[in-house]
Regions:
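Gly/Pro-biased beta-strand-loop elements
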Residues: 90-198, 219-222, 250-251, 256-320
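Intrinsically disordered, low-complexity Ser/Thr-rich linker and spacer segments
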Residues: 30-34, 88-102, 241-244
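Bacterial N-terminal signal peptides that target proteins for export
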Residues: 1-12
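Loop/turn positions that initiate beta-strands
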Residues: 49, 79-84, 227-230
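LysM (lysin motif) carbohydrate-binding repeats in extracellular/periplasmic proteins that recognize
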Residues: 47-76, 118
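Primarily a LysM-type cell-wall glycan-binding module
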Residues: 27-60
Length: 320
């Protein structure tokens, strides 16, 4: 039987365990070519009044990734002194390390400043069921501080039908859903922006736009110029290499039509493997561990291979 605790135990070992102090923005030096993993899993102790929403905001985390990394812990009352895992180790997304990269399945953005050997990463609120965020390649076409909000017709109609009508314009200020800053994307109708709500970052809550913590969106505003490329995709299964070992990071696949079946998830893993043959070739995979990681969906990289010099995994070895 799969035990999610076994995966966490491998990750939160003495080599990786850091007791978090004051939170800082999540940024990491880029690893050298051929390396894909950044950060380390951290652990903090909850205070009496803490909730996962509080802890997530203080540590640049999203709500659902906190829940996934801490199975069995009450997110509204973790308990004073309870050890809380912060899943701050990441496999960098596949593809070019440039501009803004958003992985919807992670509820997370990665930003690679041009000419710098660093990556910043931020949690996101994304489009809820029926209002999914787009999968596309686009760019930032405008930057607007202290924006007013002009609700589109579809949102006005939705709120009116719910008996909660909106004004045609919401001025800048603490009640503005866009927060202190917005980026307009080349994909019509979509924004990256702040928020007037404490809750919702790292969840499916928006009408398709990308919500950030206000401190995060203001930090990004100082760095990302108009013209910055934005690549948006949804990949729940990321493979990457670190120190000669192959790792897999698994998240819950997004599906507007219900929970994906086990077969769907395994098919997605095989697709991710084929899409990453340039890094997975040369490794013999431990399929027992892969099954654990896929079932666990805890969002933390786990080692899934035994390195070999001449034997590559083939579909004949796959136990699905």
């Amino acid at each position: 039987m799969f035990c999610r605790a076994s995966v966490v135990a491998r990750l939160v070992s003495p080599a990786f365990l850091l007791i978090a102090g004051q939170a800082a923005a999540l940024s990491f030096p880029l690893p050298p070519p051929g390396e894909d993993v950044v950060g380390e899993v951290r652990v903090i102790q909850a205070k009496y009044e803490d909730t996962f929403a509080d802890i997530a905001k203080a540590n640049d985390m999203g709500y659902l990734e906190m829940v996934a990394a801490n199975p069995g812990v009450d997110p509204w009352l973790p308990g004073e002194g309870r050890n809380i895992v912060l899943p701050t180790r990441y496999i960098l997304p596949p593809g070019p390390r440039e501009g803004i990269v958003i992985n919807l399945a992670e509820y997370r953005m990665y930003y690679y400043p041009k000419g710098e050997n660093v990556v910043y990463t931020y949690p996101l609120g994304i489009g809820r069921e029926g209002w999914g965020s787009p999968v596309t390649n686009t760019s930032i076409i405008d930057k607007i501080p202290n924006p007013a909000w002009y609700p589109p017709k579809s949102i006005l109609e939705e709120h009116a039908a719910e008996g909660n009508p909106l004004p045609k314009v919401v001025p800048p200020g603490p009640d503005n859903p866009l927060g202190p800053f917005k980026f307009r994307l080349g994909t019509p109708g979509y924004l990256i922006h702040g928020s007037n709500k404490k809750f919702g970052i790292g969840m499916r809550v928006s009408h398709g736009c990308f919500r950030m913590l206000n401190d995060n969106v203001l930090e990004l505003a100082k760095m990302a110029p108009v013209g910055t490329k934005v690549r948006i995709f949804s990949e729940p299964y990321k493979f990457g290499v670190s120190q000669g070992q192959l790792f897999l990071e698994a998240h819950t696949p997004l599906d507007d039509h219900g929970e994906p079946s086990v077969v769907d998830k395994h098919t997605a893993v095989l697709t991710a493997l084929h899409n990453n043959e340039q890094i997975t070739a040369g490794y013999q995979l431990d399929w027992n561990v892969i099954r654990e990681v896929v079932a666990g969906e805890d969002g933390m990289p786990a080692e899934v291979s035994v390195p070999v010099s001449s034997v590559a995994s083939t579909e004949a070895e796959m136990p699905f």
